[in-house]
Amino acid sequence: MYASVADLVEQFGETEIVELTDRDQAGEIDTAVAERALEDASAEIDGYLAARYRLPISEPLRLLTLLAADIARYRLQRGVATDQARQRYEDAVAMLKRIQSGQMNMPLATRPPAVAEPMVVRSGGRVFDDDALKGW
C-alpha cells in the first residue's frame, strides 16, 4: 500500500477518519475499514502506473502517499463525498493520468526495462534488378 492509516490521520485528522471508518459506532478508527480503502486506492494507482513502471513499487514517493490518502478518503465517503474530497480525488486522478501519459515523470528505480532497439537487416544489394530482368 502507498499510504497507511497513520498517513490518513496525519493528512485529515483523527476525528474525520473516525467518522469515516467507525461503522460500529465504537468511537475509534476501524483499522480494517481504513486499510481496505487504502488497498483499493493503491490498486487504482497501480492501474495508472502499470503502463510505465514495474510494480509493485517498493519505495513509493511521498506523492503516491498523498494521492493514495486522497483517493481512500473519497472512497470512504461512500457516495456522499464533500466537494473538497471530490475535487481532491479528481485532481489525484488527473495527476495519475499525466504520469501514465508521460507528461509527468516520477524518479523511480523500478522503471520497466527499456525496449530494445528495432532489428535492422542489411543486404549486399539486389542481385536481380529491373535491368537484369528485362525480357524475362
Task: Cite the ranges covered by each PLM segment.
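Short loop/turn elements at secondary-structure junctions
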Residues: 71-136
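Ordered, amphipathic secondary-structure segments that act as subunit-interaction surfaces
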Residues: 47, 51, 63-82
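Conserved short "hinge" loops at termini or chain/domain junctions
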Residues: 1-62, 118-136
